């Protein structure tokens, strides 16, 4: 049940600042942030079960990330993680890449995909007929469409807009928020009350399922910096990786 918030300001010294939490079962094998040996352009964490990624960067200040959509899974879907790695490993413009995905989106379980570079940032909701080029601004995304007003998403977007964007620790602290709304404020997405309640905070501290990583992405004038902090069961810190890609 991943969540992310970002500020997109093309034409400035920092076109993109993004924070993301990846939520997943702790038993699912994962490799930490690194350059991939089989796809050297890709710099990302890796889902070792399906082989894809949830967030990564590539040379040329290319960037992609995704979240799942809460809906019934397909019986035998393609891995959504390949949507990130295929973009990063290629040379297509982000809008062109997302446009071509529209025709095959039904082969994947529900997803939201962001793909961009220094000039353009595009968004595709799996059920949309066309991708959307994003205008400058602050956005938040979870497991429904962009800026769907779930309580934790509204809270995170507001806090992000009020935080010093140069203070990494303050930014990471936003993603450690364990606040939960009252039961009456919970969305109804078909996953049942227990799951709605468990996943209603920005940070999920579960022993079986929870936040596995927090990522901070900065796009600068000539490079991208990606920092990833990993967590074990119960939200216990499990390491940090950082890299810069020109």
Residue ranges of model-derived segments:
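N-terminal nucleophile
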Residues: 1-246
């Amino acid at each position: 049940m991943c969540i992310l918030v970002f500020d997109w300001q093309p034409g400035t010294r920092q076109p993109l600042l993004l924070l993301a939490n990846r939520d997943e079962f702790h038993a699912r094998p994962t490799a930490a942030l690194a350059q991939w040996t089989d796809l050297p352009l890709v710099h990302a964490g890796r889902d070792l079960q399906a082989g894809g990624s949830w967030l990564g960067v590539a040379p040329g200040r290319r960037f992609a990330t995704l979240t799942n959509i809460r809906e019934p899974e397909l019986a035998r879907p393609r891995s959504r993680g390949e949507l990130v790695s295929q973009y990063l490993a290629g040379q297509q413009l982000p809008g062109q890449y997302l446009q071509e995905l529209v025709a095959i989106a039904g082969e994947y379980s529900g997803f939201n995909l962001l793909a961009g570079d220094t000039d353009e940032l595009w968004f595709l909701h799996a059920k949309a007929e066309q991708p959307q080029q994003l205008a400058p601004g602050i956005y938040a995304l979870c497991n429904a469409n962009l800026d769907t007003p779930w309580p934790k998403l509204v809270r995170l977007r507001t806090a992000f807009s009020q935080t010093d964007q140069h203070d990494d620790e303050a930014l990471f602290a936003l993603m450690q928020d364990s606040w939960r709304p009252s039961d009456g404020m919970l969305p109804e997405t078909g996953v049942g009350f227990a799951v709605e309640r468990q996943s209603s905070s920005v940070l999920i501290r579960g022993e079986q399922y929870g936040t596995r990583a927090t990522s901070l992405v900065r796009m600068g004038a000539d490079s991208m910096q990606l920092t990833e902090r990993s967590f074990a069961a119960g939200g216990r810190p499990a390491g940090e990786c950082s890299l810069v890609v020109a």
